[in-house]
Every structure is written in C-alpha cells, then in structure tokens.
Regions:
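Class I Rossmann-like S-adenosyl-L-methionine
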Residues: 1-185
Length: 185
C-alpha cells in the first residue's frame, strides 16, 4: 500500500517535510542524522495516515446519511420522501469504491484510522454538505454519472480546507496533521 501512496502524496508536501526536518536537524546541532531521518519518516507516515483518514471521511458521512434514511422510514407517520429517499449520495460510485477497497480498509484497520470517536463531527459535516449549493444541485440531477459523483467529492474536499471543526478534530488526533491538510485534500 505504501508504494502506491508515495504517488498520492504531493511532491510539494514531501519537499516541505524534508526542509522542515533539515532545518530542525541543523537547529538542534545534533550529529546524529539517524534520529532526524526517523523524525522525517514519522512525519511522512503521519501524512499517509491523514490521507487515509480524509479518504474514509465521505464513507462515514454516507453511512450516517444512510442511517438517517433508515430511521426516517421507521417513523410512525413517514412521508413519501421518508419512504422513498433520494439515495444518490448514499450510492455515490466513488464512495462505494472507497468503502469496498481492501487496500483502504486494511490500511485504516492496521493504523486504527476511523471516525467513531467523532460522531458530532460527522453530523456537522453532513449538515454542511446537505446545505451546500453544490450538494443540492447534485441531488437534483435526475441522472447518475461517475463524473457527477467525482465532482461532488472534489467540491466537498475543497470545502474541507476551511472547515474549523475538522481542523480542531484533526489537531486533536495528531499534532502533525494541522499543517498537512491543505496538501492532502
């Protein structure tokens, strides 16, 4: 999986990490380059983790949306919309590919990456997503296409770059992630 990921992290992010590690090594005055290399590799590994953590985020939001749809069907007096929800987002082809990817699932499980401790963030991001114009346009289109599914996720990831609740949670998860998010999404 890591060999595939090397292509997924931007060269710019890797260069920044190398420069920061080199600067830290020179400032420390240490002669031991091995410790500095280990610090650099830890930083790069954490960037891989962030990549996967962000990659599984739309999957968790889609699961939350699906749970909401199932709960709505169980109301005492469900509406027509409750009984026949628009499942376009839940059935997003790209989200399904990510959710069913053994490579993604294996890496996330091995590194214990998930969003289970942050249901309030998932709820907040779901609300922000469903209130956005690009989501409303996506859901209103009668046809389903891979290009539309991709565009929805592109817009969602762009929006994540300035999402304060996400920044706070990511910083809580790992202090090394606070500066990397713009380069990952």
């Amino acid at each position: 999986v890591k060999t595939v990921l090397k292509d997924m992290l931007s060269r710019r992010l890797l260069r920044i990490k190398v420069v920061k590690a080199l600067f830290a090594h020179l400032k420390s005055g240490a002669d031991n380059m091995i410790a500095s290399e280990k610090t650099l590799m830890t930083s790069v590994d954490k960037a891989y983790d962030l990549y996967f953590q962000i990659l599984i985020l739309p999957v968790e939001i889609a699961r939350y949306a699906e749970q909401r749809q199932e709960l709505a069907k169980q109301k005492k007096l469900p509406t027509h919309e409750d009984l026949n929800p628009n499942t376009k987002f839940v059935d997003n082809q790209i989200i399904r590919v990510i959710a069913n990817s053994d490579a993604v699932n294996d890496y996330a499980a091995a590194r214990k990456l998930n969003w289970t401790r942050y249901p309030e963030l998932i709820r907040t991001l779901y609300t922000q997503l469903t209130e956005s114009d690009y989501f409303k346009d996506y859901m209103a289109r009668p046809e389903r296409s891979f290009a539309d599914d991709r565009k929805l996720l592109e817009d969602f990831f762009k929006e994540l770059q300035s999402c304060e609740p996400l920044d706070n949670v990511l910083e809580e998860m790992s202090i090394l992630w606070s500066d990397d998010l713009p380069y990952i999404v």
